[in-house]
């Protein structure tokens, strides 16, 4: 889960409002239309402030938006189970120590639901001072409690570097392949729980 791949659309299924993609594993993945970021859709030059006639109307029919052979960057949302392939998304999320970067989801962002009360307000104030590029958003994790804007910005800069490396790697070759593998449980535990003062 959370691994990032370059994927190739192999079949568009209008009745499912989804497509199947080859992402370099034995089974093809399932990519619902609602999980495809605007950057991959035709006519994506539309300004965000233009009026929508409902989500479906702004995007048109799925078979008009996507084509077989089209390449996308996808992230595993749910692992393969039984005879079902993995559920995928193009809305990437990269977890750092204090933040989660969503590089192609400008409408996301905020503070983890687990943070409450005054700590939530303090964390919201700290992330409001971050230099988040347009078209991206961040979520402050519980580990961000008590951290200043400078520490959070350092984490954001690292995540931005990681995202640029993922984008660059996706351009190096065509076809389906693994771009980024989520760290092991041990590495994630160290990232999330180890503090210099321990």
Question: PLM ranges: what are they?
Answer:
Residues 1-198:
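Single-stranded RNA-binding surfaces
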